[in-house]
A protein has these predicted regions:
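A conserved beta-strand-loop-helix scaffold within acyl/acetyltransferase catalytic domains
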Residues: 1-35, 63, 67-84, 99-112, ...
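Active-site rim elements
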Residues: 258-264
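Asp/Glu-rich intrinsically disordered low-complexity tracts
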Residues: 356-358, 362, 368
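Intrinsic disorder/low-complexity segments enriched in small, polar and charged residues
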Residues: 338-341
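Glycine-rich phosphate-binding "P-loop"
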Residues: 35-45
């Protein structure tokens, strides 16, 4: 039921297998914290036993626990066993039978797709388990390299999968070609809900990809899934989206502050907007679950580090650059020149970057 479940098969996870019941829990270790991606994988009836067993396993080795990307499916049992919890974002999900882009809500999506179609974009599915194509795979690798150069930051791990062409298993690959037949972008989907749903896990575009290409790939892939009888599509979780600014939970207050003020470090707002433009049919809440009930700073450090060991350094550099740019803008603005200088106040509005709609964005999630 959790779209993150398939990522258990990636090589960056350690696996805990149940001793008393059948089940598996994917995790990683940073210092004294064990980080778990998604819910434990087991039958619903076995979940209480598996969770208690894993909790004891971690406590015996004096490790704290931090679950990420957890659904509300087992939320009450986590609470019952003494875990703390807080909403950490919302998953953009699509009920494919109801998904459409007509009307005002889908206007931007239609515009982007029409732009791509006019530019000659055509979407194809690549099925490596049926027949490998060395040229297609070389092009997908080229796009990954171009995408990384555009990002100028490290790639996320643990919460995201890999392209995985060496062992595709149940992954689905959709790519787009331009008017010249050149591959310019691709999306890798992973299954969830027993293949009743597919999540866009890896989303990448190359240099010079036409505007609207990612929207076109996603829409066409969803149409293929819909025709196959698949029920759901997903773009994964938009981190820190949908939190309450007036929450009494101190952890949620901290996360709200990050969402409102630290977009120089991580584009929380931009990522939410990138998913929102696809017009999801529902936003599914996602949670952090942790023990002890009040998470310590080193637990949050583990959360960041396990996804990208370089992210803290890169975030600090981005924050400094963002602050410096705003300071330069303030000094050169007519308002600033006509009035006495004042102390700069970094407000939520001034620290929020506005997305460039002419450029392609990574629908994932995840800005990895």
């Amino acid at each position: 039921q959790n779209p993150s479940a398939y990522l258990t098969l990636e090589d960056d996870k350690l696996l805990y297998f149940g001793q008393k019941v059948d089940g598996v829990i994917p995790y990683g270790v940073v210092g004294s914290t064990i980080v778990i991606n998604g819910d434990p994988i087991c039958a619903d009836s076995d979940f209480p036993v598996l969770l208690a067993e894993f909790k004891e396993f971690c406590q015996r080795s004096a490790h704290n626990l931090f679950f990420i990307s957890v659904t509300d499916h087992f939320l009450e049992e986590y609470k019952k066993q003494g875990f703390g919890w807080v909403k950490n974002g919302e998953e953009a999900r699509f009920h494919l039978a109801d998904y459409e882009i007509s009307g005002k809500k889908g206007a931007k999506m239609r515009m982007n797709i029409n732009h791509a179609r006019k530019a000659g974009v055509v979407v194809h599915e690549y099925c490596p388990l049926k027949q490998r194509d060395a040229q297609i795979e070389a092009d997908l690798n080229r796009i990954t390299n171009e995408w990384l150069q555009q990002k100028k930051s490290s790639m996320l791990t643990f919460v995201m999968g890999t392209v995985g062409l060496e062992n595709p298993m149940d992954k689905r690959y959709f790519y787009a070609t331009d008017a010249d037949g050149k591959i310019v972008a691709f999306i890798v989907f992973v299954p969830f809900l027993g293949k009743r749903g597919y999540m866009a896990d890896v989303t990448r575009h190359g240099t010079g990809a036409p505007s609207g290409v990612m929207e076109t790939i996603l829409y066409d892939a969803f149409q293929v899934f819909k025709n196959e009888g698949i029920e759901y599509g997903s773009l994964g979780v938009a981190p820190l989206a949908g939190l309450k600014n007036d929450s009494s939970n101190p952890v949620e207050k901290l996360l709200c502050f990050a969402y409102n003020h630290l977009n120089d470090c991580y584009g929380f707002r931009d990522l939410y907007r990138a998913k929102e433009k696809y017009s999801p049919t529902e936003w599914v809440p996602s949670y952090y679950i942790y023990l002890p009930k009040i998470p310590t700073p080193d637990m949050f450090y583990a959360l960041v580090t396990i996804q990208n060991p370089h992210q803290i350094r890169e975030a600090a550099e981005d924050l400094v650059k963002g602050c410096a740019q705003r300071l330069r803008n303030k000094r050169t603005s007519p308002t600033h020149q006509s009035k006495p200088s004042r102390q700069v106040s970094w407000t939520a509005s001034s620290s929020t970057k506005q997305p460039d709609t002419r450029k392609q964005t990574d629908a994932d999630k995840k800005a990895d």
